[in-house]
Regions:
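Short capping/connector residues at structural and topological boundaries
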Residues: 56-58, 106, 202
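C-terminal cap of thioredoxin/glutaredoxin-like
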Residues: 2-6, 12, 29-36, 67, ...
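Structural alpha/beta surface segment adjacent to cysteine/selenocysteine redox centers
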Residues: 66-69, 74-150
Length: 218
């Protein structure tokens, strides 16, 4: 069996595709919508446990739905996330959660591999976003992905074992299906204190978005 045939189960992927319409990339700049999800619903237990960054009592909660093959998502994590972490997450102003919303089998595979690393999931996601062009858009993406994750300590045996884990794959798509129930139909999508924003946030607009959310939380 070649590496390219080790893609996550096509049957499960197609079932997920039938369950919810596969989205496209969101607008390049974040746009506030009229949709608001109550925090008790947004923070309800997911099919996979949330990986939370920041203090539990932070006044602003940001939940991002992302795909590993979304270029806007990669740009956000490269250009904006470092500032978000330094100025807002690490200072106790923001609690941040990234949830899986794979656009395709390549993204699902990348999320599965990141989840296989336990508490190193977010570091793996940051790495794979940084390396996105080198694995996601090649002629042999799964072979390229296998080579990329070697730098994360994932050898060939673990790579193959992880991509055969149908329980994990179903859970990742269940997270995405729940996101769609919240109104997610493109990536990246952000919920900031429950208010839905479509598209990538930029550094310039970040202070006002968070300031407005803080005011609304008081």
């Amino acid at each position: 069996m070649t590496i390219e045939k080790l893609a996550p189960s096509r049957r499960i992927f197609l079932a997920a595709a039938l369950a919810f319409s596969l989205p496209l990339a969101a607008p390049a700049k974040a746009e506030k919508t009229e949709t608001k999800v109550p925090l008790v619903e947004l923070l309800a237990p997911q099919a996979l446990p949330d990986v939370v960054e920041g203090k539990a009592d932070a006044p602003v909660l940001i939940v991002e739905y992302a795909s590993m093959t979304c270029s806007h998502c990669a740009a956000f994590h490269h250009d904006v996330y470092p500032t978000l972490k330094k100025d807002y997450i690490d200072t106790g102003k923001v609690r941040f959660i990234l949830r899986e919303f794979p656009l395709d089998e390549r993204a699902a595979a990348a999320f599965m591999l990141a989840r296989s690393l336990g508490d190193k999931r977010d570091a793996a996601i940051d790495f794979l976003f940084a390396q996105q062009r080198n694995w996601a858009f090649t002629e042999t993406p799964f072979e390229s992905l296998a080579n990329a994750v070697k730098q994360l300590g994932i050898g060939q045996a673990k790579f193959e074992e992880t991509l055969k884990d149908e329980k994990l794959q179903r859970a990742i798509y269940a997270v995405a299906e729940q996101g769609q129930k919240f109104g997610v139909n493109a990536t990246p999508t952000f919920f900031i204190n429950g208010v839905k924003f479509d598209g990538r946030m930029d550094v310039a607009g970040l202070p006002k978005i968070i300031e407005d959310a803080e005011k609304g939380a008081k």
